[in-house]
């Protein structure tokens, strides 16, 4: 019985790991707002790597009831993996507390283009800062 449970756990974990997409940080130059492609322009309160935003990320996840403080103790990169279902490199750029910038709208924080948006802009993954002309 125990060997069946162990085998199932191993296969399930391997399947999860193989099916989880990886997010990679962009290395090309910062785009202008016209080069965001199909992504929208977001105005984010905090922008930085998962490692540099560890404290605000932990607070946001706990405040919004997405995870318990026990899970946050595992580390912010693991939390993003569990909550978003996306494997995040510690150096990928994230945007926190973001909202879409309307055409002609203004932003009092950092404007970015992001590849993945989760929880109505609470966490955006794969962001690139926009040079405003």
Swiss-Prot record:
<keyword id="KW-0134">Cell wall</keyword>
<feature type="signal peptide">
    <location>
        <begin position="1"/>
        <end position="25"/>
    </location>
</feature>
<comment type="similarity">
    <text>Belongs to the fungal hydrophobin family.</text>
</comment>
<feature type="disulfide bond">
    <location>
        <begin position="43"/>
        <end position="107"/>
    </location>
</feature>
<dbReference type="GO" id="GO:0005199">
    <property type="term" value="F:structural constituent of cell wall"/>
</dbReference>
<comment type="subunit">
    <text>Self-assembles to form functional amyloid fibrils called rodlets. Self-assembly into fibrillar rodlets occurs spontaneously at hydrophobic:hydrophilic interfaces and the rodlets further associate laterally to form amphipathic monolayers.</text>
</comment>
<dbReference type="GO" id="GO:0009277">
    <property type="term" value="C:fungal-type cell wall"/>
</dbReference>
<feature type="disulfide bond">
    <location>
        <begin position="36"/>
        <end position="113"/>
    </location>
</feature>
<dbReference type="InterPro" id="IPR001338">
    <property type="entry name" value="Hydrophobin"/>
</dbReference>
<keyword id="KW-0964">Secreted</keyword>
<comment type="function">
    <text>Aerial growth, conidiation, and dispersal of filamentous fungi in the environment rely upon a capability of their secreting small amphipathic proteins called hydrophobins (HPBs) with low sequence identity. Class I can self-assemble into an outermost layer of rodlet bundles on aerial cell surfaces, conferring cellular hydrophobicity that supports fungal growth, development and dispersal; whereas Class II form highly ordered films at water-air interfaces through intermolecular interactions but contribute nothing to the rodlet structure.</text>
</comment>
<dbReference type="GO" id="GO:0005576">
    <property type="term" value="C:extracellular region"/>
</dbReference>
<protein>
    <recommendedName>
        <fullName>Unclassified hydrophobin 14</fullName>
    </recommendedName>
</protein>
<feature type="disulfide bond">
    <location>
        <begin position="114"/>
        <end position="127"/>
    </location>
</feature>
<feature type="disulfide bond">
    <location>
        <begin position="44"/>
        <end position="98"/>
    </location>
</feature>
<keyword id="KW-1015">Disulfide bond</keyword>
<dbReference type="Pfam" id="PF01185">
    <property type="entry name" value="Hydrophobin"/>
</dbReference>
<keyword id="KW-0732">Signal</keyword>
């Amino acid at each position: 019985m125990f060997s069946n449970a162990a085998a199932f756990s191993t296969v399930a974990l391997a399947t999860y790991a193989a099916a989880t997409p990886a997010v990679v940080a962009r290395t090309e130059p910062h785009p202008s707002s016209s080069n965001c492609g199909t992504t929208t322009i977001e105005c984010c309160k905090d922008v930085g790597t998962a490692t540099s935003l560890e404290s605000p990320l932990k607070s946001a996840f706990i405040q919004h009831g997405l995870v318990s403080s026990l899970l946050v103790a595992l580390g912010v990169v693991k939390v993003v993996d569990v909550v978003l279902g996306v494997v995040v490199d510690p150096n990928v750029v994230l945007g926190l507390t973001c909202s879409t910038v309307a055409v002609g709208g203004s932003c009092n924080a950092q404007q970015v283009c992001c590849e993945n948006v989760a929880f109505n802009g609470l966490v955006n993954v794969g962001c690139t800062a926009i040079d405003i002309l």
